[in-house]
Regions:
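Anionic ligand-binding catalytic core segments
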Residues: 1-68, 72-73, 77-168
Length: 168
């Protein structure tokens, strides 16, 4: 599943991704409370399902390159089969309104960036996560790919987001 967004007046909001599916959304908060530690979250998810743990790595990597400062345990979760209780996937990525453009242009340099440091330290200290992340073989985005995505954003962006993302 992919989160879909729509304009709501002057705002962008996430469409309800549970409406047309047969699964319940369960926030990570229900499993780990307010513990936002990447390693603790990854280890718990990995103990349940390694494929979903890989999706979690992609989620926090995306947060890192897009400066999403609002990834707490109520802002991501799982789709659960209500009949069996099985967790079937990570919920679509949602609630990204704090990322990149919400607070104006981002400052550079990135060598002191807390998000990059948190992600790097997490991978350095969690060997399972590090090996899994390597196996994902995530390729860098090109400026053209980023600009193509930006063309689909229905708001005016007053500075070069592509350069900011590429600098990270």
């Amino acid at each position: 599943l992919t989160a879909e967004y729509e304009m709501d007046g002057g705002y962008i909001r996430t469409k309800d991704f549970k409406e047309s599916v047969k699964y319940n959304h369960e926030p990570m908060f229900s499993l780990i409370d307010e513990d936002e530690d990447y390693s603790n979250n990854f280890n718990l998810i990995h103990s349940m399902n390694s494929s979903i743990a890989a999706d979690y790595l992609k989620l926090i990597y995306t947060d890192t390159i897009c400066c999403n400062t609002d990834r707490h345990t109520d802002n991501y979760g799982f789709l659960r089969n209500p009949d069996t209780g099985e967790i079937v996937s990570l919920s679509p990525n949602y609630d990204n309104n704090i990322a990149l453009i919400s607070n104006g242009p981002l400052g550079l340099p990135n060598e002191n960036d807390a998000f990059i440091e948190l992600f790097v330290v997490f991978l350095k200290n969690n060997i399972t996560a590090k090996e899994m992340f390597k196996s994902l073989n995530i390729q860098p985005l090109s400026k053209q790919e980023i600009e193509e995505c930006i063309q689909h954003v229905p708001i005016k962006i007053g500075y070069d987001i592509a350069d900011i993302i590429l600098s990270r």
